[in-house]
Amino acid sequence: VLAEMVRQEFAALFDDDRSRLVVDVPHNVVLTEEGVNVHRKGATPAHAGQFALIPGSMGDSSYVVRGRGQEDWLRSCSRGGGRRMPRQEVRRLAPADGQGQDWQCVTLREERRIEEAPQAYKPIGPVIEAQTEAGLIEGVARLRPWTTFKA
């Protein structure tokens, strides 16, 4: 929804803007599909041929994938690797001065940067592999982060 709002604002500002929303990443949402409500918590739609974004952490790759529409999995895929440790534990363990970090984050609230440190998340690679092997997705592109914006 936010990406679409940004796209609309750009279209209003720039006469020659031809951008269009390519990938949206709802991951805690209820959507009506085929007459029923599908609740996805930590998952995102992966309908056959539909693009999805599976984000890694600030220190790990993210992936653009194409859904395979597996009905047994409610035409869904995982939204990411998941947290390895709770936010309060990361705040306790991470150096407050950012020493030794090889990632970049722009944020309004410093505690959010620390809470989202790469070590707080599980690696995304095995998640992508498992979903590919299960026939839920096919990889399209691997994206390496260079900076992250965190509200």
Features from the language model and the residues they span:
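Domain-length cofactor-binding catalytic modules of enzymes
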Residues: 1-151
